[in-house]
Protein backbone atom coordinates (compact mmCIF):
# COMPACT_ATOMS: atom_id res chain seq x y z
CA UNK A 1 0.00 0.00 0.00
CA UNK A 2 1.27 3.49 -0.76
CA UNK A 3 0.08 7.05 -0.65
CA UNK A 4 0.58 8.73 -4.00
CA UNK A 5 2.79 11.75 -3.58
CA UNK A 6 0.85 14.39 -5.48
CA UNK A 7 -1.58 16.41 -3.39
CA UNK A 8 -5.14 17.22 -4.35
CA UNK A 9 -5.60 20.41 -6.20
CA UNK A 10 -2.02 20.60 -7.47
CA UNK A 11 -1.22 22.01 -10.93
CA UNK A 12 -2.09 19.62 -13.65
CA UNK A 13 -5.24 18.30 -12.00
CA UNK A 14 -8.07 18.34 -14.55
CA UNK A 15 -10.56 21.03 -13.62
CA UNK A 16 -13.49 18.81 -14.56
CA UNK A 17 -12.55 16.09 -12.06
CA UNK A 18 -15.52 15.86 -9.68
CA UNK A 19 -13.17 15.01 -6.80
CA UNK A 20 -10.93 18.04 -7.25
CA UNK A 21 -10.49 20.27 -4.20
CA UNK A 22 -7.89 22.84 -3.29
CA UNK A 23 -6.88 21.29 0.03
CA UNK A 24 -7.70 18.27 2.14
CA UNK A 25 -6.52 18.09 5.73
CA UNK A 26 -5.35 15.25 7.87
CA UNK A 27 -8.66 15.25 9.71
CA UNK A 28 -10.46 14.02 6.61
CA UNK A 29 -7.67 11.54 5.96
CA UNK A 30 -8.17 9.85 9.33
CA UNK A 31 -11.72 10.53 10.45
CA UNK A 32 -13.45 7.51 8.97
CA UNK A 33 -10.85 4.88 9.89
CA UNK A 34 -10.37 6.55 13.23
CA UNK A 35 -13.56 4.91 14.38
CA UNK A 36 -11.98 1.60 13.77
CA UNK A 37 -14.52 0.24 11.33
CA UNK A 38 -13.51 1.88 8.07
CA UNK A 39 -10.50 1.16 5.94
CA UNK A 40 -7.64 3.50 5.38
CA UNK A 41 -8.44 4.17 1.73
CA UNK A 42 -7.43 7.75 1.13
CA UNK A 43 -9.73 8.30 -1.84
CA UNK A 44 -12.58 7.72 0.62
CA UNK A 45 -10.98 9.61 3.48
CA UNK A 46 -9.94 12.79 1.73
CA UNK A 47 -12.88 15.03 0.97
CA UNK A 48 -12.25 15.59 -2.69
CA UNK A 49 -9.01 13.98 -3.72
CA UNK A 50 -8.80 12.42 -7.18
CA UNK A 51 -8.28 8.71 -6.61
CA UNK A 52 -5.46 8.76 -9.17
CA UNK A 53 -3.54 11.46 -7.28
CA UNK A 54 -4.01 10.65 -3.59
CA UNK A 55 -4.87 7.04 -3.00
CA UNK A 56 -4.11 4.08 -0.80
CA UNK A 57 -3.47 1.04 -2.91
CA UNK A 58 -3.87 -2.25 -1.09
CA UNK A 59 -2.11 -4.96 -3.07
CA UNK A 60 -4.32 -7.70 -4.39
CA UNK A 61 -2.49 -10.38 -2.42
CA UNK A 62 -3.39 -8.70 0.87
CA UNK A 63 -7.02 -8.40 -0.19
CA UNK A 64 -7.20 -12.06 -1.21
CA UNK A 65 -5.50 -13.16 2.02
CA UNK A 66 -7.83 -11.08 4.19
CA UNK A 67 -10.84 -12.37 2.23
CA UNK A 68 -9.75 -15.98 2.73
CA UNK A 69 -9.25 -15.42 6.46
CA UNK A 70 -12.60 -13.66 6.77
CA UNK A 71 -14.43 -16.43 4.90
CA UNK A 72 -12.85 -19.11 7.10
CA UNK A 73 -13.77 -17.19 10.25
CA UNK A 74 -17.27 -16.58 8.92
CA UNK A 75 -17.91 -20.27 8.20
CA UNK A 76 -16.40 -21.58 11.45
CA UNK A 77 -17.97 -18.85 13.58
CA UNK A 78 -21.40 -19.03 11.99
CA UNK A 79 -21.59 -22.82 12.23
CA UNK A 80 -20.13 -22.90 15.74
CA UNK A 81 -22.37 -20.20 17.18
CA UNK A 82 -25.47 -21.47 15.37
CA UNK A 83 -24.98 -25.00 16.67
CA UNK A 84 -24.21 -23.59 20.12
CA UNK A 85 -27.41 -21.54 20.15
CA UNK A 86 -29.43 -24.49 18.82
CA UNK A 87 -27.84 -26.78 21.41
CA UNK A 88 -28.68 -24.46 24.29
CA UNK A 89 -32.23 -24.00 23.00
CA UNK A 90 -32.99 -27.72 23.01
CA UNK A 91 -35.01 -28.92 25.97
CA UNK A 92 -32.75 -31.89 26.71
CA UNK A 93 -29.70 -29.66 26.66
CA UNK A 94 -31.20 -27.31 29.22
CA UNK A 95 -32.06 -30.22 31.49
CA UNK A 96 -28.52 -31.56 31.24
CA UNK A 97 -26.85 -28.27 32.15
CA UNK A 98 -29.12 -27.79 35.18
CA UNK A 99 -28.00 -24.23 35.88
CA UNK A 100 -28.41 -20.72 34.54
CA UNK A 101 -25.07 -20.78 32.74
CA UNK A 102 -26.77 -21.83 29.49
CA UNK A 103 -28.58 -18.48 29.35
CA UNK A 104 -25.26 -16.63 29.41
CA UNK A 105 -23.72 -18.96 26.85
CA UNK A 106 -26.74 -18.60 24.58
CA UNK A 107 -26.70 -14.82 24.81
CA UNK A 108 -22.99 -14.74 24.02
CA UNK A 109 -23.46 -17.08 21.05
CA UNK A 110 -26.21 -14.80 19.73
CA UNK A 111 -24.09 -11.64 20.00
CA UNK A 112 -21.14 -13.38 18.31
CA UNK A 113 -23.38 -14.71 15.55
CA UNK A 114 -24.94 -11.29 14.91
CA UNK A 115 -21.48 -9.70 14.80
CA UNK A 116 -20.40 -12.11 12.08
CA UNK A 117 -23.64 -11.90 10.08
CA UNK A 118 -24.19 -8.14 10.24
CA UNK A 119 -20.68 -6.70 10.27
CA UNK A 120 -18.32 -8.97 8.36
CA UNK A 121 -20.04 -9.02 4.92
CA UNK A 122 -20.40 -5.22 4.84
CA UNK A 123 -16.82 -4.70 5.93
CA UNK A 124 -15.44 -7.18 3.43
CA UNK A 125 -17.31 -5.56 0.55
CA UNK A 126 -17.17 -1.84 1.30
CA UNK A 127 -14.02 -1.50 3.44
CA UNK A 128 -11.70 -4.12 1.94
CA UNK A 129 -12.59 -4.33 -1.75
CA UNK A 130 -14.83 -1.39 -2.75
CA UNK A 131 -13.82 1.59 -0.62
CA UNK A 132 -16.17 4.03 -2.30
CA UNK A 133 -18.89 4.84 -3.10
CA UNK A 134 -20.75 3.69 0.02
CA UNK A 135 -23.42 1.34 -1.32
CA UNK A 136 -25.98 1.09 1.47
CA UNK A 137 -27.39 4.59 1.92
CA UNK A 138 -27.49 6.89 4.93
CA UNK A 139 -29.77 4.61 6.97
CA UNK A 140 -27.51 1.68 6.17
CA UNK A 141 -24.47 3.64 7.33
CA UNK A 142 -25.99 4.64 10.66
CA UNK A 143 -27.62 1.23 11.16
CA UNK A 144 -24.41 -0.64 10.36
CA UNK A 145 -22.37 1.17 12.99
CA UNK A 146 -25.21 1.05 15.52
CA UNK A 147 -25.72 -2.70 15.17
CA UNK A 148 -21.99 -3.39 15.07
CA UNK A 149 -21.37 -1.44 18.26
CA UNK A 150 -24.44 -2.91 19.97
CA UNK A 151 -23.22 -6.44 19.25
CA UNK A 152 -19.72 -5.50 20.40
CA UNK A 153 -21.06 -4.18 23.70
CA UNK A 154 -23.28 -7.25 24.09
CA UNK A 155 -20.37 -9.63 23.51
CA UNK A 156 -18.12 -7.89 26.03
CA UNK A 157 -20.85 -7.59 28.66
CA UNK A 158 -21.95 -11.19 28.12
CA UNK A 159 -18.40 -12.43 28.71
CA UNK A 160 -18.27 -10.33 31.88
CA UNK A 161 -21.66 -11.61 33.04
CA UNK A 162 -20.56 -15.19 32.41
CA UNK A 163 -17.54 -14.58 34.62
CA UNK A 164 -19.81 -13.18 37.34
CA UNK A 165 -22.07 -16.24 37.10
CA UNK A 166 -19.13 -18.65 37.34
CA UNK A 167 -17.63 -16.68 40.23
CA UNK A 168 -20.84 -16.97 42.24
CA UNK A 169 -21.35 -20.63 41.34
CA UNK A 170 -17.83 -21.65 42.35
CA UNK A 171 -16.89 -19.27 45.16
CA UNK A 172 -20.33 -18.58 46.70
CA UNK A 173 -22.54 -21.56 45.78
CA UNK A 174 -25.17 -20.82 48.46
CA UNK A 175 -25.61 -17.21 47.39
CA UNK A 176 -25.73 -18.41 43.79
CA UNK A 177 -28.76 -20.57 44.55
CA UNK A 178 -30.63 -17.44 45.64
CA UNK A 179 -29.26 -14.84 43.25
CA UNK A 180 -29.09 -16.88 40.04
CA UNK A 181 -32.66 -18.01 39.59
CA UNK A 182 -33.83 -18.52 36.02
CA UNK A 183 -36.16 -15.52 36.08
CA UNK A 184 -33.48 -13.21 37.49
CA UNK A 185 -30.94 -14.46 34.98
CA UNK A 186 -33.32 -13.79 32.08
CA UNK A 187 -33.96 -10.27 33.37
CA UNK A 188 -30.24 -9.68 33.83
CA UNK A 189 -29.41 -10.78 30.29
CA UNK A 190 -32.27 -8.68 28.91
CA UNK A 191 -30.79 -5.71 30.77
CA UNK A 192 -27.42 -6.44 29.15
CA UNK A 193 -28.93 -6.27 25.66
CA UNK A 194 -30.88 -3.12 26.51
CA UNK A 195 -27.73 -1.49 27.90
CA UNK A 196 -25.80 -2.53 24.78
CA UNK A 197 -28.40 -0.92 22.52
CA UNK A 198 -28.43 2.28 24.58
CA UNK A 199 -24.63 2.47 24.61
CA UNK A 200 -24.64 2.16 20.81
CA UNK A 201 -27.23 4.93 20.25
CA UNK A 202 -24.56 7.65 19.84
CA UNK A 203 -23.48 5.93 16.62
CA UNK A 204 -26.82 6.87 15.05
CA UNK A 205 -25.85 10.53 15.44
CA UNK A 206 -22.11 10.16 14.90
CA UNK A 207 -22.02 8.38 11.54
CA UNK A 208 -23.76 9.20 8.29
CA UNK A 209 -23.52 9.20 4.53
CA UNK A 210 -21.87 12.21 2.93
CA UNK A 211 -20.95 13.12 -0.62
CA UNK A 212 -17.32 14.23 -0.63
CA UNK A 213 -17.14 15.18 -4.30
CA UNK A 214 -16.39 18.81 -5.14
CA UNK A 215 -19.90 19.56 -6.39
CA UNK A 216 -21.60 17.29 -3.85
CA UNK A 217 -23.43 15.48 -6.64
CA UNK A 218 -21.03 12.87 -8.00
CA UNK A 219 -22.17 9.36 -7.00
CA UNK A 220 -18.58 8.20 -6.57
CA UNK A 221 -18.12 10.63 -3.69
CA UNK A 222 -20.54 8.89 -1.30
CA UNK A 223 -18.83 7.73 1.89
CA UNK A 224 -19.95 6.50 5.30
CA UNK A 225 -18.09 8.74 7.72
CA UNK A 226 -18.38 10.64 11.02
CA UNK A 227 -20.54 13.73 10.58
CA UNK A 228 -19.67 15.50 13.86
CA UNK A 229 -16.67 17.45 15.08
CA UNK A 230 -13.41 15.52 15.41
CA UNK A 231 -13.07 16.28 19.12
CA UNK A 232 -16.50 14.75 19.76
CA UNK A 233 -15.59 11.71 17.70
CA UNK A 234 -12.53 11.17 19.87
CA UNK A 235 -14.64 11.34 23.03
CA UNK A 236 -17.06 8.75 21.63
CA UNK A 237 -14.15 6.46 20.71
CA UNK A 238 -12.64 6.66 24.19
CA UNK A 239 -15.96 6.06 25.94
CA UNK A 240 -16.58 3.11 23.64
CA UNK A 241 -13.15 1.67 24.39
CA UNK A 242 -13.68 1.98 28.14
CA UNK A 243 -17.17 0.46 28.16
CA UNK A 244 -16.58 -2.31 25.61
CA UNK A 245 -13.04 -3.31 26.57
CA UNK A 246 -11.39 -1.82 29.66
CA UNK A 247 -14.32 -2.28 32.05
CA UNK A 248 -15.17 -5.86 30.93
CA UNK A 249 -11.48 -6.77 30.87
CA UNK A 250 -11.03 -5.67 34.48
CA UNK A 251 -14.11 -7.62 35.57
CA UNK A 252 -13.08 -10.73 33.65
CA UNK A 253 -9.47 -10.61 34.81
CA UNK A 254 -10.27 -10.09 38.49
CA UNK A 255 -13.06 -12.67 38.70
CA UNK A 256 -11.28 -15.33 36.68
CA UNK A 257 -8.15 -14.85 38.78
CA UNK A 258 -10.24 -15.45 41.91
CA UNK A 259 -11.90 -18.48 40.28
CA UNK A 260 -8.55 -19.91 39.19
CA UNK A 261 -7.14 -19.46 42.69
CA UNK A 262 -10.22 -21.14 44.18
CA UNK A 263 -9.91 -24.08 41.82
CA UNK A 264 -6.21 -24.35 42.62
CA UNK A 265 -7.03 -24.55 46.33
CA UNK A 266 -9.69 -27.19 45.65
CA UNK A 267 -7.20 -29.26 43.65
CA UNK A 268 -4.59 -28.98 46.41
CA UNK A 269 -7.09 -29.96 49.10
CA UNK A 270 -8.33 -32.86 47.02
CA UNK A 271 -4.77 -34.13 46.57
CA UNK A 272 -3.83 -33.70 50.24
CA UNK A 273 -7.07 -34.85 51.88
CA UNK A 274 -8.00 -37.87 49.84
CA UNK A 275 -10.07 -36.20 47.13
CA UNK A 276 -12.07 -34.08 49.60
CA UNK A 277 -12.21 -30.29 49.23
CA UNK A 278 -13.97 -27.45 50.98
CA UNK A 279 -16.46 -25.22 49.17
CA UNK A 280 -18.28 -22.17 50.49
CA UNK A 281 -18.05 -18.54 51.52
CA UNK A 282 -17.29 -16.72 54.73
CA UNK A 283 -20.34 -17.85 56.70
CA UNK A 284 -20.87 -21.40 55.50
CA UNK A 285 -18.65 -24.16 54.20
CA UNK A 286 -18.98 -27.84 53.45
CA UNK A 287 -16.76 -30.69 52.37
CA UNK A 288 -17.26 -32.39 49.05
CA UNK A 289 -15.76 -35.59 47.73
CA UNK A 290 -14.32 -35.45 44.25
CA UNK A 291 -13.74 -38.43 41.98
CA UNK A 292 -10.07 -38.94 41.00
CA UNK A 293 -10.76 -37.89 37.43
CA UNK A 294 -12.10 -34.56 38.63
CA UNK A 295 -8.71 -33.52 40.00
CA UNK A 296 -7.23 -33.50 36.51
CA UNK A 297 -10.37 -31.78 35.21
CA UNK A 298 -9.99 -29.01 37.79
CA UNK A 299 -6.33 -28.53 36.86
CA UNK A 300 -7.45 -28.26 33.25
CA UNK A 301 -10.08 -25.74 34.30
CA UNK A 302 -7.46 -23.49 35.91
CA UNK A 303 -5.46 -23.41 32.69
CA UNK A 304 -8.50 -22.73 30.50
CA UNK A 305 -9.82 -19.94 32.71
CA UNK A 306 -6.49 -18.18 32.22
CA UNK A 307 -6.74 -18.87 28.49
CA UNK A 308 -10.15 -17.16 28.39
CA UNK A 309 -8.65 -13.96 29.78
CA UNK A 310 -5.66 -14.15 27.44
CA UNK A 311 -7.88 -14.78 24.40
CA UNK A 312 -10.05 -11.78 25.25
CA UNK A 313 -7.02 -9.49 25.58
CA UNK A 314 -5.24 -10.81 22.49
CA UNK A 315 -8.31 -10.48 20.27
CA UNK A 316 -9.55 -7.11 21.51
CA UNK A 317 -6.51 -5.13 22.67
CA UNK A 318 -4.95 -4.53 19.20
CA UNK A 319 -8.36 -3.53 17.83
CA UNK A 320 -8.84 -0.83 20.45
CA UNK A 321 -5.20 0.29 20.29
CA UNK A 322 -5.68 1.02 16.60
CA UNK A 323 -8.84 3.02 17.29
CA UNK A 324 -7.08 5.03 19.97
CA UNK A 325 -4.28 5.89 17.54
CA UNK A 326 -6.65 8.41 15.99
CA UNK A 327 -7.25 10.02 19.39
CA UNK A 328 -3.69 10.37 20.59
CA UNK A 329 -1.48 10.77 17.52
CA UNK A 330 -1.24 14.40 16.49
CA UNK A 331 -1.63 15.60 12.91
CA UNK A 332 2.08 16.31 12.61
CA UNK A 333 3.00 12.74 13.55
CA UNK A 334 1.10 11.10 10.71
CA UNK A 335 3.57 10.12 7.99
CA UNK A 336 3.18 8.06 4.81
CA UNK A 337 4.82 5.13 6.63
CA UNK A 338 2.36 5.46 9.51
CA UNK A 339 -0.51 5.56 7.04
CA UNK A 340 0.77 2.29 5.53
CA UNK A 341 1.17 0.71 8.96
CA UNK A 342 -2.29 1.87 10.02
CA UNK A 343 -3.99 0.43 6.95
CA UNK A 344 -2.50 -3.05 7.29
CA UNK A 345 -2.78 -2.92 11.08
CA UNK A 346 -6.47 -2.34 10.45
CA UNK A 347 -6.76 -5.62 8.58
CA UNK A 348 -4.91 -7.60 11.26
CA UNK A 349 -6.81 -6.11 14.20
CA UNK A 350 -10.21 -6.57 12.60
CA UNK A 351 -9.37 -10.18 11.78
CA UNK A 352 -8.54 -10.68 15.47
CA UNK A 353 -11.80 -8.94 16.35
CA UNK A 354 -13.72 -11.55 14.37
CA UNK A 355 -11.59 -14.35 15.83
CA UNK A 356 -13.08 -13.40 19.20
CA UNK A 357 -16.56 -14.09 17.78
CA UNK A 358 -15.40 -17.41 16.33
CA UNK A 359 -13.32 -18.89 19.13
CA UNK A 360 -15.94 -19.00 21.90
CA UNK A 361 -17.67 -22.24 20.78
CA UNK A 362 -14.23 -23.82 20.45
CA UNK A 363 -13.36 -22.80 24.00
CA UNK A 364 -16.65 -24.17 25.30
CA UNK A 365 -15.89 -27.54 23.73
CA UNK A 366 -12.37 -27.57 25.12
CA UNK A 367 -13.44 -26.61 28.63
CA UNK A 368 -16.59 -28.59 29.32
CA UNK A 369 -16.89 -32.28 28.53
CA UNK A 370 -20.60 -32.02 29.29
CA UNK A 371 -21.09 -29.21 26.79
CA UNK A 372 -18.90 -30.95 24.22
CA UNK A 373 -21.02 -34.10 24.45
CA UNK A 374 -24.24 -32.12 23.90
CA UNK A 375 -22.67 -29.97 21.15
CA UNK A 376 -21.45 -32.97 19.16
CA UNK A 377 -24.79 -34.72 19.60
CA UNK A 378 -26.55 -31.66 18.18
CA UNK A 379 -24.06 -31.44 15.32
CA UNK A 380 -24.71 -35.10 14.57
CA UNK A 381 -28.45 -34.37 14.34
CA UNK A 382 -27.86 -31.49 11.94
CA UNK A 383 -25.08 -33.07 9.87
CA UNK A 384 -25.59 -36.61 8.46
CA UNK A 385 -21.86 -36.99 7.73
CA UNK A 386 -20.96 -36.19 11.33
CA UNK A 387 -23.72 -38.53 12.52
CA UNK A 388 -22.11 -41.49 10.73
CA UNK A 389 -18.71 -40.68 12.21
CA UNK A 390 -20.08 -40.53 15.75
CA UNK A 391 -21.92 -43.87 15.81
CA UNK A 392 -20.67 -45.60 18.95
CA UNK A 393 -22.11 -47.14 22.14
CA UNK A 394 -23.56 -44.67 24.57
CA UNK A 395 -21.85 -44.20 27.91
CA UNK A 396 -23.14 -43.21 31.29
CA UNK A 397 -21.74 -40.81 33.83
CA UNK A 398 -21.44 -41.62 37.48
CA UNK A 399 -22.84 -39.07 39.86
CA UNK A 400 -20.35 -37.22 42.02
CA UNK A 401 -20.58 -38.22 45.66
CA UNK A 402 -21.24 -35.44 48.14
CA UNK A 403 -20.69 -35.56 51.89
CA UNK A 404 -21.90 -32.56 53.87
CA UNK A 405 -24.75 -31.20 55.91
CA UNK A 406 -26.12 -29.72 52.71
CA UNK A 407 -27.30 -31.37 49.52
CA UNK A 408 -25.53 -30.43 46.32
CA UNK A 409 -26.38 -31.88 42.92
CA UNK A 410 -23.67 -33.83 41.12
CA UNK A 411 -23.80 -31.43 38.21
CA UNK A 412 -22.74 -28.55 40.45
CA UNK A 413 -19.29 -30.08 40.50
CA UNK A 414 -19.18 -30.44 36.73
CA UNK A 415 -20.35 -26.89 36.31
CA UNK A 416 -17.26 -25.48 38.02
CA UNK A 417 -16.03 -25.30 34.46
CA UNK A 418 -17.62 -23.20 31.73
UniProtKB/Swiss-Prot annotation:
Disulfide bond positions: 141-224
A Pfam family hit: 7tm_1
Topological relation to the membrane, as annotated: Multi-pass membrane protein
Cytoplasmic side: 89-102, 165-184, 260-303, 365-418
Keyword annotations from UniProtKB, A to Z: Cell membrane, Disulfide bond, G-protein coupled receptor, Glycoprotein, Lipoprotein, Membrane, Palmitate, Receptor, Transducer, Transmembrane, Transmembrane helix
Tissue specificity field: Expressed in prostate (at protein level). Detected in colon and peripheral blood mononuclear cells. Detected at very low levels in brain.
Posttranslational mods: N-glycosylated.
Gene3D superfamilies found in the cross-reference section: Rhodopsin 7-helix transmembrane proteins (1.20.1070.10)
UniProt-annotated stretches for the region Neurotensin binding: 321-344
Residue spans, topological domain Extracellular: 1-67, 123-142, 206-234, 326-343
Entry text on domains: The ligand binding pocket consists mainly of extracellular loops ECL2 and ECL3, as well as transmembrane regions TM6 and TM7.
PANTHER family (UniProt xref): G-PROTEIN COUPLED RECEPTOR (PTHR24243), NEUROTENSIN RECEPTOR TYPE 1 (PTHR24243:SF9)
Biological function: G-protein coupled receptor for the tridecapeptide neurotensin (NTS). Signaling is effected via G proteins that activate a phosphatidylinositol-calcium second messenger system. Signaling leads to the activation of downstream MAP kinases and protects cells against apoptosis.
Family: Belongs to the G-protein coupled receptor 1 family. Neurotensin receptor subfamily. NTSR1 sub-subfamily.
UniProt name for this protein: Neurotensin receptor type 1
Organism: Homo sapiens (Human)
Annotated gene: NTSR1
